[in-house]
């Protein structure tokens, strides 16, 4: 069943080509009328890639969510070919539903080049094998969920998530520092394609990010004492990676004010498998 959920996500991110620079995507049911923001980011990235010269891969993207997406309607992705330079390519993608833009994203792509390289070390925390899966946490609290929602609550998801003890989204809300660490990976093998791994990480990057800024305020989705939505989202891709191997997603929230929370995250990799081919 878990592999079925991943195959469904891969299909969801594989857009229908309508005509030059125009693509159409469908939406998944996440338990409400709105479209999941990570889905739109991943689909918009896929649309942009379809217009980019080969051997150039996204290194940064900056997006704004303009309106809530409606799960019942397809999404049209309109790609603007802003610039094709000697080393860099720039694209803009507008996602449209019912004649109105719901999302706007700028992306920059870069060909492989040699240069200086460094990175920070991974922090010393318990590994994924020492953490309990989010699904197991849900099973322990299923008695608190209304009967009609239980099957959906326990549904298989394409991304496996393991929280450090006391840091899960479904923990009893209590005042905590505005940071957390999550192990995540796709539940099955992803084809050796850089773009698919990037699109799936883009999808996963919007999972649980918002709740980081709620930690100091005893707010929790599990308690239903807060409503939230993403306003914008940015990502930087520094190196090739595999989204089907364990990744540590460390998030923190430097500030929350005026009914807005600022959340940021970094991804460190824990694997020895070869990265996807260029």
Each model region followed by its residue ranges:
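Local beta-strand/beta-hairpin segments that build beta-sheet-rich folds
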Residues: 94, 101-102, 273
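Hydrophobic, proline/glycine-rich low-complexity stretches
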Residues: 1-74, 82-86, 91, 113-115, ...
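Conserved small/polar residues in nucleotide/adenosyl-binding loops
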Residues: 271-278
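Segments adjacent to and within acyl-thioester-processing domains across lipid
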Residues: 102-212
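Short tryptophan-centered beta-strand motifs in secreted/extracellular beta-sheet-rich domains
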Residues: 77, 249
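Low-complexity, intrinsically disordered Gly/Pro/Thr-rich segments
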Residues: 261-267
């Amino acid at each position: 069943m878990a592999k079925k959920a991943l195959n469904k996500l891969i299909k969801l991110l594989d857009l229908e080509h309508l005509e030059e620079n125009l693509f159409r995507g469908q939406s998944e049911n996440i338990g409400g009328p709105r479209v999941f923001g990570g889905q739109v980011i991943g689909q918009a990235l896929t649309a942009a890639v379809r217009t980019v010269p080969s051997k150039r891969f996204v290194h940064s993207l900056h997006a704004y969510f303009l309106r809530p997406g409606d799960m019942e309607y397809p999404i049209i992705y309109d790609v603007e070919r802003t610039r094709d330079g000697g080393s860099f390519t720039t694209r803009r993608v507008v996602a449209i539903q019912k004649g109105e833009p719901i999302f706007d994203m700028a992306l920059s792509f870069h060909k492989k080049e040699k240069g200086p390289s460094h990175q920070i070390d991974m922090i010393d925390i318990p590994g994924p094998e020492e953490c309990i899966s989010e699904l197991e946490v849900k099973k322990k609290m299923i008695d608190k969920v209304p009967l009609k929602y239980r099957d959906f609550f326990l549904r298989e998801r394409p991304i496996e998530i393991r929280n450090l003890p006391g840091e899960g989204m479904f923990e009893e809300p209590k005042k905590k520092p505005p940071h957390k660490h999550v192990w995540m990976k796709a539940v099955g093998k992803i084809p050796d394609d850089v773009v698919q791994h990037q699109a799936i990480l883009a999808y996963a990057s919007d999972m649980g990010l918002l709740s980081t800024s709620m930690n100091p305020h005893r707010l929790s989705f599990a308690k239903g004492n807060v409503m939230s939505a993403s306003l914008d989202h940015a990502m930087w891709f520094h190196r090739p990676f595999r989204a089907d191997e364990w990744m540590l997603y460390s998030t923190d929230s430097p500030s929350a004010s005026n009914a807005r929370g600022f959340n940021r995250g970094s991804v460190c990799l824990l694997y020895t498998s070869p990265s996807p081919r260029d």
